[in-house]
């Protein structure tokens, strides 16, 4: 379709711009929960047509990306929260681990964080159905994080976050949505300086401004159309 073509071309132009500056770009589509797991209501019949992701991935030979769909389908465990639409902390860690591998920078800490905090959050589906619910989802928490927040950060839902890790390597600019909330802590441990930006359109001037070595673009499968609807600022005429 025209939308798929425009999305792919936008990503290609972003990557061309970024790699021309001797920097690396990586694209991540966060799968919809129902794209990976069963148990949808019986009145929702699964379409036999190819999904937007399937059609998109077939055209992205010139874009560096993580196939998070294959990554999660290759695992027996469920890596999404039970009462939330997002991947859980273990799932986020899997994606971060894969991203660092593809960017040629293995994780500084190879061990998955082991501190398990029960009832640390309330899932978005739970809040939708039962607004007064108490926290009922568990989270993995880094036992001894080295990174620090530069921006005043009350929540990872904030549209703009900056971090510093004195022992990290290089710098990162990440254009993201809420799926990256539980990626931020892990990524921030790897980079001396990192920026996480939820604003759309993507402002690629930040890549040069902050001398980013790596650029990660993460977006939910259900929001893929936003890439071709809101062209990155450097493409705007």
Question: Where in the sequence are the language-model features?
Answer:
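Extracellular glycan-modifying ectodomains
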Residues: 1-237
């Amino acid at each position: 379709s025209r939308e798929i073509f425009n999305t792919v071309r936008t990503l290609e132009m972003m990557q061309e711009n970024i790699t021309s500056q001797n920097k690396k770009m990586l694209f991540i589509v966060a799968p919809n929960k129902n794209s990976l797991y069963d148990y949808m209501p019986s009145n929702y019949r699964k379409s036999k047509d190819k999904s937007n992701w399937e059609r998109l991935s077939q055209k992205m030979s010139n874009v560096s990306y993580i196939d998070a769909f294959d990554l999660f389908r290759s695992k027996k465990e469920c890596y999404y929260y039970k009462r939330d639409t997002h991947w859980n902390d273990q799932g986020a860690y899997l994606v971060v681990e894969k991203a660092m591998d593809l960017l040629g920078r293995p994780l500084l800490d190879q061990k998955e964080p082991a501190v398990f905090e029960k009832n640390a959050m309330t899932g978005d589906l739970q809040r939708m159905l039962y607004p007064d619910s108490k926290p009922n989802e568990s989270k993995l928490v880094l036992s001894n994080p080295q990174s620090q927040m530069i921006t005043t950060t009350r929540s990872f839902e904030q549209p703009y976050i900056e971090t510093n890790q004195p022992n990290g390597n290089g710098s990162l600019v990440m254009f993201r949505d809420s799926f990256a909330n539980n990626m931020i802590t892990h990524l921030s441990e790897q980079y001396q300086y990192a920026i996480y930006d939820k604003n759309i359109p993507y402002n690629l001037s930040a890549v040069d401004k902050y001398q980013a070595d790596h650029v990660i673009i993460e977006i939910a499968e259900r929001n893929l159309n936003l890439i071709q609807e809101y062209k990155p600022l450097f493409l705007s005429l």
